[in-house]
Structures are given as C-alpha cells and as structure tokens.
Amino acid sequence: VGSGNPEEGELRPQLLDRFGMHAEIRTVRDPETRVRVVEERSAFDQNPDECLAANAEQLEALKKQITDAQELLTSVELDYEFRVKISQVCGSLDVDGLRGDIVTNRAAKAYAAYNGRSKVTLEDIEKVITLCLRHRLRKDPLESIDSGDKVSSVFEEVFN
C-alpha cells in the first residue's frame, strides 16, 4: 500500500508499474458527511475500545467475508475468453509488459471470491480493470481524457 500527493510530482512509470492497483481518492465535499467522519474519528481518538466494540458485529462479518474469500480463491475460475479479452484491453491501451494482464486476472478472481462466487463474471472484470490499468498508461500531455475513462472506454469496446 502506498499513498502520494500528485501535487508533489508524478512517480516514474517503472515504479508505478510495481503497484498492482491504483485507486484515486478525492476529498469528501458534502458537509454532513465530513462532519460525520470528523465526529467518528474524534470518538475513536477518545475511546478506541468503545468504537471497536460498537462496530464489532460489522468487523466480524467483514473478517468472515475475507476469510471465506481466501478459502474460495484457489478454486475461482476465469474463462479463457475473458482472459483473452483482458489481454486485448491491455494491448489496445499499449500497456507495457504483462503485469497489467496478470494483476487484472488476479483482481477479478479475488473480487469474485469476495462476493462468494467461484466463477468470474463480466461485472467482476469491469469493477477491477480500471483500478489495475489506469496507472499503467502512458501520459500524453495533449490528451484531455482521464486515464480511467480511457480504460473504461476500451473495456466497453472489447467486451461488448
């Protein structure tokens, strides 16, 4: 897991490629949500044990979902047709190397397992592919399209 502030400069592509997935996080703008987050954080800072106890049921359910997914993961199937299409998306986007293909295959299987399925669906791939590929695209200073939008667009072309 890594984090960074894009205002501090970009990472070199060979370093970015080492990250399996890339999530873009934006600051929450809704004032009510911001207040709730600040209140929950303050409550946790004042009494972490109480906060953990109050959320114990949710934490246990999440823990069980993760351990169940780990057990299921080795038996999750990803059809050959989907693997070919994932590689076609990577090729169309001119992704260097094979790491993008590998990570997308693994992430789709993990997401299917997390949702209790033993077979990857189109929706599983759609959910993870942008996270796996957006940071692997070459930056073109003249292009105004967001890299995530570009991945989504190529995904739609290849899979539909």
Residue ranges and their predicted role:
Residues V1, P13, D17, E32-E40, ...:
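Solvent-exposed alpha-helical segments within well-ordered globular domains of core cellular machineries
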Residues D49-T104:
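Conserved AAA+ ATPase small/helical "lid" subdomain
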Residues S87-R99, A110-N160:
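C-terminal engagement/docking regions of AAA+ P-loop ATPases
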Residues V1-A56, A69, Y111:
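Canonical AAA+ ATPase core
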Residues P31-E39, L73, S144-S153:
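Short secondary-structure transition/capping segments
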Residues E24, L73, N115:
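Short, flexible active-site loop motifs that bind/organize anionic cofactors or intermediates
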